[in-house]
Amino acid sequence: MEAFIPMITGKLNKVRLGSCARNIVSRQRLAVALRASLALCGILVSVRPASAQAAAPLWTFAVSGDSRNCGDFVMPAIAAKVKADGDAFYWHLGDFRWISSPDEDLLAMHPDMKREDYQSLAWDDFLTHQIASFGSIPVFLGRGNHENIKPMTRDGYIAKFSSFLDRPEIAAQRITDGSAAAPPGPWYHWTQGWVDFITLDNASQEEFSTSQLKWLRFVLDRDLAPNSGVRAIVVGMHEALPHSTGSEHAMDDWDLGDRTGSLVYTWLYDAQAAGKHVYIIASHSHYYSPAIFNTPYWKQYSNEVVPGFIIGSAGARRYPLPRSADKDALTHIYGFLQGAVQSDGSIVFTLHELTEDDLIQARWQDTPLDAIHDCFVNNAESVR
């Protein structure tokens, strides 16, 4: 059975849906049947406030992005929460430091720092004052556009963060994938339990490249194969895929990004239609926003969309919310998403918002309290 879905050309073309949808729908009844069938399969996701009652998860993980500007104050507080909750790992979706100018947290400690001195120590500062806070908790890194600002390059990024890009979990997955595995670099995946976590790279306008798309197609085909054991797919990236509620600051900004990002969305939609629990998480925009693909563009093809989130709240200068943002979206906050893996294979995502006291309690020695306060109260853009 076929449905009309936008493909890489940006026009309406035909793409085959997965076997789950193929067995139950006709083109004329696609929207109604998919809504019913996905509900039966438990595809829908909810975002609950931290106070909500929920079934005990099997395990949890944490994710956010954009820790430039004030991340040296915010990330230790995120790490403290992650450790206290016993999360399995923390996933950073990119933009570790500002690079184009010194970050406010570093200027608070070194007010006379020059730009060239800042750029020479920014990445080590990220490792020392942000990632070190997590201790033995595994940390997975994604590349943001600020990791593409000179003097940093793609090759430089791979060299600097090689120990994170080739973690034991990723290296083991590479062995399992065999000849189709991606070499150590900014895109990779690993399977934990029955969940496949996929890190994509859209930090530059050369992405998504043909090689990255070919690799992703292999990974998804593997997940969709009978007896793969994969029940959920979580895809993380820096910039949101096109035509989301955050389209003003996403892959819509360049032609290749629009075309290839739309293609990736249709692939993930197809995986969801085939019965997998699929979730897409991005940062880049410095706010929290759920249901980002619940837009007229994607709903013209099906009333059921892939659950998606923006969580760029790990310390970067906060942005105003777009007018199209979901009613539960929030800005002028710091925090992260916690994913709770359920026994039915679904994942419940909860926003964990930080207080100023959280930042104070987790601060590094000699951190000025007035600098923390300034980052918590200010560090925002009024107009974009």
Residue ranges and their predicted role:
Residues 39, 50-52:
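Cleavable N-terminal signal peptides
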Residues 1-29:
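N-terminal secretory signal peptides that target proteins for export/translocation
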Residues 60, 104-229, 252-277, 287-340:
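Extended active-site neighborhood of metal-dependent phosphoesterases/phosphodiesterases
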Residues 33-45:
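Bacterial N-terminal signal peptides
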Residues 223-250:
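Short acidic, glycine-rich surface-loop motifs adjacent to enzyme active sites
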Residues 52-117:
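N-terminal active-site segment of His-dependent metallophosphoesterases
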